[in-house]
Design a protein with these regions (language model features):
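C-terminal accessory helical subdomains adjacent to catalytic cores in phosphodiester-
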Residues: 2, 13-40, 47-207
Length: 207
């Protein structure tokens, strides 16, 4: 049985399935599958999530689907002026999409503020040259926000340390392969929220 994740980019598609499984599988009776669909960018992903989720949940063979998860970066959309905090933006956006899909097998979650935030949990996974210029006063990973979101921070550090840009589909994939999921969950409450949601859905199916 498997989860279907609808994401917005190549980083998610190429990198996060094994990372998420490494946290979930030890807590389940049987290992689960995770299939990630890349919708090529935030705007397209958000526009497509409702129809994609419904199609997956209604397709033949859907009894093998534990649930469909929408996963988009919180960094990207424009928010109404009264939504000023991360919690407000997360909650309002989550509720909006889940109401539209209207299926208990669907959950909407957001990476706060990008999936690269999870990588910031452990500077030891980065090249030594990047570690040597690591910001001493770096905030908790999910507080690295709109001013310089995680991917832009990493791009700046990589350029300064190596003279090369940070490539999401190359460096990101390599780094996620090194990252301990328990370390990331301990440092990222919204990641923990998503994984605990997935764990509860899997256990409800007897896994």
């Amino acid at each position: 049985m498997r989860f279907e994740i609808i994401s917005e980019g190549k980083t998610e598609k190429d990198s996060i399935a094994k990372f998420l499984k490494s946290w979930l599988d030890p807590k389940l009776t049987n290992p689960i599958g995770i299939k990630v669909t890349d919708e090529m960018g935030f705007a397209r992903a958000l526009r497509k999530i409702e129809t994609k989720a419904k199609a997956k949940l209604e397709a033949p063979g859907n009894e093998q689907i534990i649930g469909v998860i929408g996963l988009i970066d919180l960094y990207g959309p424009e928010y109404q002026s009264h939504l000023t905090t991360v919690e407000q933006r997360y909650r309002e956006s989550k509720e909006l999409v889940e109401r539209a899909v209207n299926d208990q097998r669907f959950r909407m979650h957001f990476a706060v503020h990008e999936v690269e935030a999870w990588l910031l949990c452990d500077k030891g996974i980065f090249p030594r040259a990047v570690q040597e210029i690591w910001p001493a006063s770096l905030r908790p990973p999910e507080e690295v926000n709109f001013n310089e979101p995680p991917a832009k921070l990493l791009d700046r550090l990589y350029k300064q340390a190596t003279g090369k840009t940070y490539k999401k589909t190359v460096n990101g994939k390599e780094l996620f392969g090194k990252l301990n999921s328990s370390t990331a969950v301990a440092a990222c409450p919204y990641l923990k929220l998503m994984l605990e949601d997935m764990l509860a859905m899997a256990k409800a199916r007897g896994l």
